[in-house]
């Protein structure tokens, strides 16, 4: 009997599905990595007993000790339940074969859901000994492992779901009714079509098409997998769902296979160009021959590599060459990985590279959820349960697992980023320092699989982890000291080549502003993907400039006007002298080695910068409304600003977050030298607070593992947007109550809860509102306002002499521009009370200031200028004659005088 079972096991491995997708047996489970928390919840309908409780494996770098017992229990239950479906063939014989005709086989193939596993590499050696008849007979057999006896049982249960399983197929496949919210964002069942009927139907994933994905081939020679089959196999055998979804999102951001690869190649060529041109200009040109030379060959040094470049420079060249070779090797592996994602998009999601530039991310999530529904039964890997939890919220949590911790880390202000020196007392975060923080903290707290290490959840490990973190800071400081000279040279040349032409053609761009790195981390919401955040920031620039330009700077204007006059006068004198002697005067040296052309260029640049710095435009002074409108874009309003929106102090605080680009560039260059000292003297003082931070903000999510608690959007958010002053009774697995945070005050708890609720509100708007389902380069369309609301808004915001000089009113008290057109943006938040939430977050805002919030003060869009034409046309139609002409004249000419 044992020999018969061994024969069956030997023949089972030679079936067609085992050649194409690998074997499906309990042996696969022995090689499962337990770093990812997920087991598929198989619910068994057994008479007289309840369904088996699903086991929860910790998603981290440590495995569960009860993993094998749970697996054996599931397999035994499945074996007992599968016996009842044998029907007329249910003799229970282990060695019985089920004959199928070609027509039946074709019918079964149509309704078969691919169940894929991963076999051993030695199976291909035995494929030529099998016959086609044995493959057809064994194609639908499964081996079920008995956990008590360790014997292999073979059931003749076929996989033709419609034909054999019937109504009990759901119990075997584990498809139970969803118990969570029935929505696209948090749902566990296919409910997208009911919620988005107005959206054009997207193409279904190319998984269960008319013809089978598996093509029968000659038994003597196995055929290679097609691109579609390989993509399906990769999807069914994903071992790290976090990394896979991050690759899927990076592919979406990169606009497809060719764009990503070309960008990588061009980045490498940019590095090679900077190194080559800097070396050539410094070693291979004789600058002493420039005044007398007339050709490039006159100043070029022949064989400069042998004669001019020293041994140290040559050694650095060889090191750089090794680095380039390693980058090329890395690019090769990136090519293979990106090509697999390309096949996943093309064959399983039915999304081409050309569509990625315009298709919304919500549609990609939609296709992934459809793919999960169609391929519910997958390989016996640890990601089965995780795939069953795929929705928009879980996908965002997996993609931003580390970023959510960083958002909370920077918002809690527990990092010491300043030095005790006069010019560097303020906390300044630069890109260089940000990269070092990510390397030292995130690289230490998370394992290679991307999950939080469980040692951070153990309070007993606090001292050990803090000491290790301090050592990492000190080591990173030494590495930055060693690399500082090369980084300084590289970034100086990079910024020079990148911004020189921009400043040369438009010197006024020196006064442009952009958000600082710390501002971006404070403005970003939890689970807000990068393309949504960058789009929101891009829409806020114009509003931010309008707010800052409302504050006059008389002292600065006087200074810039004087410098502008002096520099312009010298340029005019030199230009006049050039007209008198155009041939020789341009090369005339005013100082040593400085010609007239040089001074005209420098003075002309100074004049252009001063001219752009002087603000001669007259605008309506209403900084309070402008800042409130800006807050709807940046989602940042500290309590210290309450009641002071119109003051210059708030404007100065905002300018620290929205600084001049030139200042930011200088800070980046200075940080290359200052970062090692911050890593040595400042950040080690925050090591204990950082370890406590990870322990206090970490919660367990079913199917997700340990994530940041603010990114989970707990039930307090989903049930009415209620704000709590304490996180009550939420226990983590390590026995720490989230409400017992003795290190943080109630104000900090309220601040964190407010940001979490705000993040939840905008997350729902991004994914639930069909208006926001646009590509990463597009802006949502605004909904048209009704004629009555437009007329009411027009009557409140447009000037009329009748309003100003009506009886019983004071003309000097009439305020123009109390409601700006930008504040009347159309509503895209139809499903949630945004104004009520903002009133809760900022209770000092009066009702008069938010009376137009219910009209739809959108955070992502405002009404274009063209949308105001119907208002003006309706005005003209309603007011003909002399009074109508006066009304039109005053509205277009006198507003703002």
Swiss-Prot record:
Membrane protein topology class: Multi-pass membrane protein
Intramembrane portions: 432-452, 662-682
Swiss-Prot/TrEMBL GO biological process terms: cytoplasm to vacuole targeting by the Cvt pathway; mitophagy; piecemeal microautophagy of the nucleus; protein localization to phagophore assembly site; reticulophagy
Highest rank taxon of the organism: Eukaryota
Modification after translation (UniProt): Phosphorylated by ATG1. ATG1 phosphorylation is required for preautophagosome elongation.
Region Disordered, annotated ranges: 46-106, 112-131, 195-224
A GO molecular-function descriptor: phospholipid scramblase activity
Subcellular location(s) per record: Preautophagosomal structure membrane; Cytoplasmic vesicle membrane; Golgi apparatus membrane; Endoplasmic reticulum membrane
Lumenal side: 278-314, 494-558
Function: Phospholipid scramblase involved in autophagy and cytoplasm to vacuole transport (Cvt) vesicle formation. Cycles between the preautophagosomal structure/phagophore assembly site (PAS) and the cytoplasmic vesicle pool and supplies membrane for the growing autophagosome. Lipid scramblase activity plays a key role in preautophagosomal structure/phagophore assembly by distributing the phospholipids that arrive through ATG2 from the cytoplasmic to the luminal leaflet of the bilayer, thereby driving autophagosomal membrane expansion. Required for mitophagy.
Subunit relationships: Homotrimer; forms a homotrimer with a central pore that forms a path between the two membrane leaflets.
Family the UniProt entry places it in: Belongs to the ATG9 family.
Protein name per Swiss-Prot or TrEMBL: Autophagy-related protein 9
């Amino acid at each position: 009997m044992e020999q018969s079972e061994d024969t069956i096991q030997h023949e089972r491995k030679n079936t067609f599905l085992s050649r194409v997708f690998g074997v499906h047996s309990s042996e696969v489970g022995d090689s499962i990595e337990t770093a990812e928390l997920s087991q598929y919840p198989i619910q068994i309908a057994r008479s007289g007993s309840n369904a088996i409780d699903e086991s929860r494996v910790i998603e981290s770098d440590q495995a569960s000790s009860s993993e094998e017992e749970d697996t054996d229990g599931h397999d035994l239950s499945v074996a007992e339940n599968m016996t009842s479906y044998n029907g007329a063939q249910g003799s229970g014989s282990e060695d019985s074969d089920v004959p199928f005709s070609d027509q039946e086989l074709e019918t079964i193939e149509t309704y078969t859901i691919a169940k894929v596993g991963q076999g051993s590499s030695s199976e291909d050696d035995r494929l030529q000994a099998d016959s086609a008849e044995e493959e057809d007979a064994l194609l639908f057999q499964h081996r079920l492992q008995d956990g008590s006896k360790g014997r292999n049982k073979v059931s003749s249960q076929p996989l033709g779901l419609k034909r054999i399983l019937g109504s009990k197929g759901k119990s075997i496949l584990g498809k139970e009714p969803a118990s969570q919210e029935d929505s696209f964002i948090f749902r566990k069942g296919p409910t997208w079509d009911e919620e988005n009927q107005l959206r054009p139907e997207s193409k279904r994933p190319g998984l269960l098409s008319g013809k089978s994905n598996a093509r029968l081939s000659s038994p003597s020679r196995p055929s290679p997998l097609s691109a579609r089959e390989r993509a399906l196999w990769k999807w069914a055998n994903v071992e790290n769902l976090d990394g896979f979804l991050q690759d899927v999102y990076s592919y979406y951001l990169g606009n497809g296979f060719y764009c990503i690869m070309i960008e990588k190649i061009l980045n490498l060529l940019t590095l090679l160009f900077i190194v080559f041109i800097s070396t050539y200009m410094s070693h291979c040109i004789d600058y002493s021959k420039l005044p007398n030379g007339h050709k490039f060959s006159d100043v070029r040094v022949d064989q400069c590599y042998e004669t001019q470049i020293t041994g140290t420079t040559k050694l650095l060249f060889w090191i750089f060459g090794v680095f380039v070779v390693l980058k090329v090797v890395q690019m090769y592996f990136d090519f293979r990985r990106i090509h697999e994602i390309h096949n996943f998009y093309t064959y399983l999601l039915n999304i081409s590279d050309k569509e990625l530039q315009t298709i919304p991310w919500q549609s990609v999530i939609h296709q992934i959820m459809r793919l999960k529904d169609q391929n519910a039964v997958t390989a016996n890997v640890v990601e089965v349960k995780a795939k069953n939890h795929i929705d928009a919220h879980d996908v965002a949590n997996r993609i931003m697992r580390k970023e959510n911790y960083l958002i909370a880390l920077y918002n809690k202000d527990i990092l010491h980023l300043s030095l005790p020196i006069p010019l560097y007392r303020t906390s300044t975060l630069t890109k260089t320092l940000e990269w070092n923080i990510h390397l030292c903290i995130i690289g230490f707290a998370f394992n290679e699989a991307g999950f939080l290490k469980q040692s951070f959840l153990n309070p007993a490990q606090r001292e050990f982890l803090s000491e290790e973190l301090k050592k990492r800071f000190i080591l990173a400081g030494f590495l930055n000291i060693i690399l500082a000279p090369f980084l300084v040279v590289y970034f100086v040349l990079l910024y020079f080549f990148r911004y020189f032409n921009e400043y040369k053609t438009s010197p006024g761009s020196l006064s442009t502003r952009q958000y600082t790195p710390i501002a971006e981390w404070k403005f970003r919401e939890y689970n807000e993907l990068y393309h949504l955040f960058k789009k929101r920031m891009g829409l806020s620039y114009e509003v931010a400039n309008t707010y800052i330009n409302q504050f006059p700077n008389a002292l600065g204007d006087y200074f810039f006007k004087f410098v502008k006059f002096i520099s312009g006068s010298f340029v005019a004198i030199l230009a006049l002298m050039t007209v008198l002697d155009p041939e020789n005067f341009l090369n005339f040296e005013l100082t040593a080695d400085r010609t007239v052309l040089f001074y005209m260029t420098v003075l002309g640049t100074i004049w252009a910068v001063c001219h752009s710095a002087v603000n001669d435009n007259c605008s309506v002074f209403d900084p309070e409304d402008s800042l409130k409108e800006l807050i709807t874009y940046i989602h940042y309003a500290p309590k210290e600003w309450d009641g002071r929106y119109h003051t210059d102090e708030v404007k100065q605080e905002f300018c620290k977050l929205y600084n001049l680009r030139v200042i930011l560039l200088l800070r980046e260059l200075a940080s290359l030298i200052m970062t090692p000292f911050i890593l040595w003297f400042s950040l080690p003082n925050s090591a204990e607070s950082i370890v406590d931070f990870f322990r206090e903000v970490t919660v367990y999510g079913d199917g997700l593992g340990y994530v940041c608690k603010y990114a989970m959007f707990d039930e307090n958010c989903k049930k009415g947007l209620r704000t709590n002053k304490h996180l009550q009774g939420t226990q983590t697995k390590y026995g720490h109550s989230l409400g017992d945070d003795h290190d943080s005050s109630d104000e900090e708890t309220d601040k964190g809860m407010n940001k979490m609720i705000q993040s939840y509100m905008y997350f729902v708007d991004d994914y639930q509102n069909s208006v926001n389902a646009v590509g990463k380069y597009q802006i949502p369309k605004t909904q048209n306002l009704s004629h009555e609301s437009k007329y009411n808004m027009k009557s409140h915001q447009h000037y009329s002499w009748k309003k100003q000089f009506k009886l019983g009113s004071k003309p000097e008290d009439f305020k123009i521009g109390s409601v700006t057109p930008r504040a009347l943006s159309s509503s895209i938040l139809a499903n949630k009370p945004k104004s009520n939430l903002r009133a809760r977050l900022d209770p000092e805002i009066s009702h008069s200031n938010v009376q137009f919030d219910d009209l739809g003060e959108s955070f992502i869009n405002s009404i274009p200028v063209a949308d105001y034409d119907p208002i003006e046309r309706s005005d003209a139609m309603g007011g003909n004659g002399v009074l109508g002409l006066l009304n039109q004249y005053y509205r277009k000419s006198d507003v703002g005088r």
